């Protein structure tokens, strides 16, 4: 999950959570498919390197049944740069550091940009509807936040981009400076999470602090919003809100903060993204709702936003489409 806490003066104001985290970039959220464009494009080169360096034990782990699932393979690939056997062999980190490899890959970078943009966009919508002050600092914790560095390791650049998202959503200038914490060299996001647990006294989160934003009508889930209450109009309006987001991300934001100039996104991948973001949104939404209903009762209150269900599907399809375009060159 991605868990977001809105805090002011060391006090938690609001909390929201949704199942849209780094694993969403490396798996098909709606099937058991073992295909993922990002992983399939890169894993062969890394396997060849393991063979070349005669790292048989790591080669066996690579080929294990556990790593057939692409999100598991992604976790394994990310771990290699810190592996003691890799370090002992003196392998150049540039060739084995999966995070670094993805940073240098301009073809798939649009996927990571959309991932980040969608989360900040959602946060900005909550800030707007709750009348909160836009954040002075945004801090990332947890291993999944390392994915942010794939977009850029320059926190100032990312802060400028993030401020523009807020300004466009809020329709007004940003009231302060914005610092992105957690991108500096040597920062361990998982360690930050642990330290926070030790330093901060535990207090029970009140129900009225937990919010679930409904992007289709710019309101928040109430006790009346149950899974059984979701009708076709609700779904259609949600799809429209997703279409609005993709137009915002791929057109509005790219026009004011050129993705190629700032992040190194290729024009071809941007073109593919604009095509894929229009496909099967309702199907992805319905599959996401159905999966969530398997974990809930029909009369249960909706526990997470539907906003990210179609985005998950699009990002997976986009990874496949970019992979196909590269293999067909």
Regions found by a protein language model. Name each.
Residues 11, 129-131, 161-164, 204:
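Secondary-structure transition/capping motifs at alpha-helix termini
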Residues 175-329:
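Acidic, glycine/GT-rich loop-and beta-edge segments that sit at the periphery of enzyme/chaperone cores
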Residues 147-176:
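Conserved helicase motor "Helicase C" RecA-like lobe of SF1/SF2 P-loop NTPases
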Residues 29, 70, 135, 173-175, ...:
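Proline-rich intrinsically disordered, low-complexity coils
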Residues 3-153, 215, 219-244, 261-282:
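Phosphate-binding glycine-rich/basic clefts of nucleotide- and phosphate-handling proteins
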